């Protein structure tokens, strides 16, 4: 899934990443804010635009789930001002990478954004040594496990990009 990677050396180009889950209140905002934190700490904020969205309309306008908010706060990461938004067809042209959390998200993303001719749509753990779904903590209640998987995947992905600068 690394065959379409953008060259960070091009001037004035930001890598645009959209993380996607079912409701945009647990996993995708967790990935959004973890990646923003990692990018900031690496001094690369000017080179990335990072956001998140939902495949469903169920939570649109709602804030981040308290479990995600609490877990991220443990690491000094704030999600203030984040409200659930839905994935739009126009997002395909706007983002370089559209990253889902599980196969159900992936199916819905491909339905909503047909013809992925630029190979933009992936699962977050596609970049890990053990590609798989990230379970939804809305159901599992395990925000710790979700945080660990999301953080490791975001770290690996960011390192991969930095190695190619």
Give short role names for the model-derived ranges:
Residues 12-94, 159-165:
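Conserved active-site segments centered on acidic
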Residues 1-13:
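Short, Lys/Arg-enriched N-terminal segments with co-localized hydrophobic residues
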Residues 2-4, 62, 142:
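Intrinsically disordered, low-complexity regions
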């Amino acid at each position: 899934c690394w065959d379409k990677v953008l060259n960070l050396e091009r001037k004035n180009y930001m890598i645009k990443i959209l993380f996607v889950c079912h409701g945009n209140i647990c996993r995708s905002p967790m990935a959004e804010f973890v990646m923003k934190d990692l990018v900031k700490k690496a001094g690369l904020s000017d080179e990335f635009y990072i956001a998140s969205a939902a495949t469903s309309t169920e939570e649109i306008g709602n804030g981040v789930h308290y479990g995600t908010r609490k877990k991220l706060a443990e690491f000094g990461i704030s999600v203030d001002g984040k409200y659930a938004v839905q994935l739009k067809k126009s997002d395909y042209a706007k983002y370089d990478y559209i990253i889902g959390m599980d196969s159900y998200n992936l199916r819905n993303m491909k339905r909503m954004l047909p013809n992925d001719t630029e190979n933009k749509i992936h699962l977050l753990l596609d970049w890990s040594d053990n590609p798989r779904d990230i379970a939804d903590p809305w159901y599992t209640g395990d925000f710790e496990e979700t945080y660990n998987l999301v953080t490791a995947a975001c770290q690996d992905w960011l390192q991969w990009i930095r190695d190619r600068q």
